[in-house]
Structures are given as C-alpha cells and as structure tokens.
Amino acid sequence: MLIAVPLDDTNFSENLKKAKEKGADIVELRVDQFSDTSLNYVKEKLEEVHSQGLKTILTIRSPEEGGREVKNREELFEELSPLSDYTDIELSSRGLLVKLYNITKEAGKKLIISYHNFELTPPNWIIREVLREGYRYGGIPKIAVKANSYEDVARLLCISRQVEGEKILISMGDYGKISRLAGYVFGSVITYCSLEKAFAPGQIPLEEMVELRKKFYRL
C-alpha cells in the first residue's frame, strides 16, 4: 500500500519537504487547486517532486466531481501525463479517457480512472460497473464515495473484492476512515492522507497513517 499526499501550490516546497520527511510515497498534484495553471509552472512542480525521489499523481479534477475549472486542462494532461508516474482522470471525462490511455501507455506510466460520489455509496451494481469500466479503459479504477454507515463501508470493500485487479477504494467521511487503512486487504493499492489540510472528508494525517501501516502491514 502506497501513501499519497495531495498538495496544492500553497507553500509547495515547504510542504513537499514535510511530506517526504514524514514518509509519503506519492504526491498528488491537485492542479485544479493551483493559483497558476500555466504549463511551465505545473511542470516545475512536477519536476520538483521527482527531484525529492517521490512519485507523482497528476490530478486536474473536473468541477462536476469536486474540482475547479481549468481552461487549459486538456493541454496540461497531454503534455504532462507522460512525465507523471500516475495520471488521474474521471470516468465521466470519457472524451479524454482513450487519449490519456494511449499517452500514458506509450510513456510507460499508469492511468487512474476515478469515480466520486460525495452524497452516498451507490448500489452494488454501480460499484461493479465502475470497476469494470476502469479496467476496460486500461486503468486503475478509483472509487471514492460517501459512507453514511459502517454497512456502506463494508459493502464497498466486499463488493470490490469480487472484481480482480489493482484498484483504489475510499469511503469518505467519518464512517469511512477505516477504509483508508483496511482497503489494502481488499486490493486497494494507494491511500490518500492529509498533510496541512484535508482534500476529502475523512483523510487521516500522514504521520498517523505511516505508523498504522507499519503496525498492521509491516510496510
């Protein structure tokens, strides 16, 4: 299980240093939260993360799934996906999916295909369909959904376990905190933690997750 820390560009160098010192494996660049989204600026941040020996997830979240509008979004994806270890694109952004799959495959990088629901955990058939669609497009499916009960958490993890392959599973909110650690047992390969601020409900602080990973998984 790899630990990712989402960062915007506020105090970027300082927070990057903290992320490395506290044990993060990956920095997720939340470009939709950047103050400057010009190509050269974002590229510099990507290169800065790599210079510290950490992997990167390039994320430019769409407004429909909790992000902000970035007018040069497609350009950034096309130019920077070959440089990032992972690129995160929403399943709903179908116009970009095939293009990004081809770009990342040619560059030897990985594509995360994400689905978000900030209100509830959807029915079982939707969970299965999202996973299968993610694999069909050649990526690692990521499901991040709001848990309104512990039953929601158990359902997401157990249903997802029935579909083979790498995946990322997140139950958001207080009920779902356990999924950020236990998801590994059910095939989840990356967990997201907070550094200075949480980018999603229920994120566990980085230092705490590093210790929990050592304690439970000896990783």
UniProtKB/Swiss-Prot annotation:
Pathway connected to this protein: Metabolic intermediate biosynthesis; chorismate biosynthesis; chorismate from D-erythrose 4-phosphate and phosphoenolpyruvate: step 3/7
Superkingdom of source: Bacteria
GO molecular function: 3-dehydroquinate dehydratase activity
Amino acids binding 3-dehydroquinate: 28-30, 61, 180, 203
Entry's EC annotation: 4.2.1.10
Signal peptide interval: none
PROSITE patterns the record matches: DEHYDROQUINASE_I
Catalytic center residues: 116, 142
GO BP annotation list: 3,4-dihydroxybenzoate biosynthetic process; amino acid biosynthetic process; aromatic amino acid family biosynthetic process; chorismate biosynthetic process
The keyword Ribosomal protein appears for this protein: no
Pfam families: DHquinase_I
InterPro entries: 3-dehydroquinate_DH_AS, Aldolase_TIM, DHquinase_I, Type-I_3-dehydroquinase
Record's keyword terms, sorted: Amino-acid biosynthesis, Aromatic amino acid biosynthesis, Lyase, Schiff base
Reactions that this protein is recorded to catalyse: 3-dehydroquinate = 3-dehydroshikimate + H2O
The protein's role, per its UniProt record: Involved in the third step of the chorismate pathway, which leads to the biosynthesis of aromatic amino acids. Catalyzes the cis-dehydration of 3-dehydroquinate (DHQ) and introduces the first double bond of the aromatic ring to yield 3-dehydroshikimate.
Subunit structure: Homodimer.
Stored PANTHER family: 3-DEHYDROQUINATE DEHYDRATASE
HAMAP family: AroD
Family label: Belongs to the type-I 3-dehydroquinase family.
Protein name: 3-dehydroquinate dehydratase
Organism: Aquifex aeolicus (strain VF5)
